[in-house]
Every structure is written in structure tokens, then in C-alpha cells.
UniProtKB/Swiss-Prot annotation:
Protein name per its UniProtKB record: Transaldolase 2
Superkingdom to which the source organism belongs: Bacteria
Pfam families: TAL_FSA (PF00923)
GO biological process: carbohydrate metabolic process; pentose-phosphate shunt
Primary site of residence: cytoplasm
Gene3D superfamilies associated with the record: Aldolase class I
Annotated catalytic residues: K140
Family listed: Belongs to the transaldolase family. Type 2 subfamily.
Pathway(s): Carbohydrate degradation; pentose phosphate pathway; D-glyceraldehyde 3-phosphate and beta-D-fructose 6-phosphate from D-ribose 5-phosphate and D-xylulose 5-phosphate (non-oxidative stage): step 2/3
Compartments, record wording: Cytoplasm
Cellular component terms (Gene Ontology): cytoplasm
UniProt GO molecular function: transaldolase activity
Amino acid sequence: MTDALKRLSKEGVAIWLDDLSRKRITSGNLAELIDQQHVVGVTTNPSIFQKAISQGDGYDQQVSDLAARRVTVEEAIRMITTADVRDAADILRPVFDATDGQDGRVSIEVDPRLAHNTKATVAEAKQLAWLVDRPNTLIKIPATKAGIPAITEVIGLGISVNVTLIFSLERYRMVMDAYLAGLEKAKERGLDLSKIHSVASFFVSRVDTEIDKRIDALGTPEAKAARGKAGLANARLAYEAYEAVFSTDRWLALDKAQANKQRPLWASTGVKDPAYKDTMYVEELVAPNTVNTMPEATLEATADHGEIRGNTIAGTYEQARADLDAVEKLGIAYDDVVQLLEEEGVDKFEASWNDLLKSTEAELQRLAPSEG
């Protein structure tokens, strides 16, 4: 066991857990991770909830109660997931208070079937914020074309947001612009900007997985030399964009009004390829005012053998551009890759949501009271 997680925190990287389940809450495991592993936040998504509810037995009593009330399957899912998020938020509340609202956050995602519907996404975000009813909740909105204006509207209402499924630098700049526009709306409405927070979830390993697959298909030595570089390069250039946007006059005017910067959050940080070190997306993306949300396996690997070498983003931008250029020169189109990943990301979450509907419906039927 190393002190890597402690050192990571000291470098300004907030450690969040990319997982949540009823068992993790009731067993005391989440509280233990907060106390012992420097975890200061939690992210969830439809895939996480689908796995938790379909595999765990910690939900039987609540599902039985919901079945007795004859609620719809959609109502049941909302009741179950918001209960978990509410309980996790309560456990993290001391962290939230100690960090003035920056950390101690729990994220819950809007229905992924609404990813291409701005109006419905805004309505869903408002409903989720009301249902969870905790100040340390972040509502996750996907960075689709329809999601961008939804971000502005929801931030403008004073609701804190985790923008998810960001793969491209262009889309990330749109996300930051949407956040600033939302803050400007909130300011016009007289809202307290210091209470509004946001993170932008920039996905890392999926970029390498897709590009490496195309590199392997080429099979040349030049192609192989580019393996495992695009994901980090993309994320590092995202941090460069973050530094640029949050030093503009537009931002400084909001800063004077006590607004908070939208922190970059490194998502999809579990290493998929065994050829790479299992802590690569933690060790190589260390910079101030960032978040790294980790699956438990990555968290444990970092605690066990992580090597934190200080800031590993500063001074990398020129090399990062060269790494992405090398991929383009191989005939692998960056724009095609990131567009595909966004579409697949939405599709995966939607598939998980549909699986969640089916498994929850089956549980409602199994635990329904007998007639008579």
C-alpha cells in the first residue's frame, strides 16, 4: 500500500468513486472509502444502477413496498435510484460542508433516452433535483448537441451539473461556453453563483480503445508506435482548453460574482488494455482543480502501487498535439472517432436503462403481493 491517494489529493485532484449500490451504502463501505481512501465524491450512471439492482439483494424490501403500491416500473426506478443517491449524499455531506460545496458530491443521470431532447432533459433535471432534494447532488446531462442548451438552462436555474460523455475538444469548448452562459443567466436572475457547481466529464480510455483498434488493424510499425497515446493527449489538450477559457475576461467577470470554475473530470479511467499500466489514466492526468472518478479496481490499484510524480499535464501540450497529429497521419480521423464514441456512449447508457427497466419490472412482479 502506498500513499498515492493522499499525494494525489495534495496535488489538487479530487478522488471520486465511479460506483454506487445499496450494499455499498448500508455496509459502511462508502463511509470507509471516504475515511481511509480519500474518496470525496461519487458518480453513477445507468449501467452502474442496472448492475447494482439486478445483482444485489439490498433492494428487496423497497421493491416489495413499491410493488404493493402498484407503482409503474419507471416510478420504481426513480424511487430506488434517488434513494441511493440521497443516502450517499448524506454520507458525503461533511465533505461537502468542509470544501464549501466543491466536493462531497453525488451525480445522478437524466434518463438517457432523452439525450437528444433539450426540453425533456431540462424537465428531467429539475425533477431529479427535486426528488433527491440534497444540495450536494450533481445532475448528469450528456454533452450531445441537444444537451448543450440544456446545460445552460439548468445551470441558469441554479442546479449544479455534471456534464457527461465528452469525447472531443470542440464539444468540450461548447460545454464550457454553455456553463458560462448558464452562470450569466443565473446572475441575471439574482441567484447566488457561489452555490452553483459543475464538472465536465471528459472520457479517456474509450478514446484509446477505439483508436488502438484501428491502429492494430493497420499493423504497421508506424501505427503501433502511436498506440496508447491518443486518450492522454486528448485529455491533456482538454486541460489546456480549460486553462484558456477560465482566464478570459468573460470568466473573470463571473469570478468577481463568486462563480465557481467548472472542473475537468477524468472519466473512463479504468484501463481496458492489459498492455498498459492499470493506473495510467490516474498517474498521467495529475493537475490542479481536476477530478478523477475511478472504478473501485482502479482506486485499489492506485492505493496499492500508484506512483504520483506531481503535475503530469503541465508542459505536455506540444507533445499531445504531435500525438494526435500522428494518429491523423495514419488515416484515422479524430472527428470520426469522437463522433462514434459519443453515439456509442448514449447507446450504451440507453441499453443499460432498458435492461434496468426489464430487470426492475421482473423484480416488481416477483415481489408483488398475491391477490386476495
